[in-house]
Amino acid sequence: MRTILLTIAYDGTDYYGWQIQPDLPTVQGEIEKALHRVTGKEIHINGTGRTDRGVHAYGQCATFRIGDGIPTDRIAYALNNSLPGGIRIVSAEEKPEGFHARFDAKGKTYRYRLLLCGPHEDADGAPQAQRQLLYLRNYVYQVNRPLDLAAMRKAAAAMEGTHDFACFQAAGGEERETTVRTVYRVELTERCLEEGFFPEEESAHVLDIDVTGDGFLYNMVRIMAGTLVDVGSGRIGAADVPAVIESADREKAGHTAPPQGLYLMRVYFEEDFGHGEE
């Protein structure tokens, strides 16, 4: 039997998250159905992360066991021919026996994308950002107020390091032995989606929040992103963020940013964790 590691990209808009749910479309469910069509066998896959409904991925990973038959270098091609358009297998590689996508993961990078409110209006007097949201609404969190990016970067720096991140954990997730995690990097990058992306001659400004850590609590990145937005809008002081973390009190942190702005960018394993970016 071979152990196969898949790297997977998907648009989470039409799926009820990663994990299989009865009678609902999920990413895991679609991949397992594709595996059955390709191999004729019932094959269970184990994902690194259980992304929620509406969350996207560029670099989700999953492992499964398979016998002889389809060559490893043909698995991605075969599955992509059987999968819906919103799910793509980026790569498939054979790993040593016992390798597990979840338990052997050493870290992840997530990206949270904000659509910043545009200052200009079009000929009809409608803000450009409102029109842009028609095309981006499933992939960004639109923020309709100015943000103090310097304050947000100061707060982001306070989120780095090894801490008890209970303040950034939502209720309802899987029970954890500890809420202590190490966040290696929280980086904010302004980007412009250039003219030509939209039907009209306009561009969109986005702010990407990239978070790399050894593990994450339930909704942790979305709450971190919401907290940074609250810092940027003045609802939480940047200097108060260390005390918020120290409190371990969810009520003291910011709001939970919506799912559609979140992307799982990369999973790190022993051989590559800490040696690259997303």
Language model features with spans:
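Structured-RNA-binding interfaces characteristic of tRNA pseudouridine synthases
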Residues: 1-278
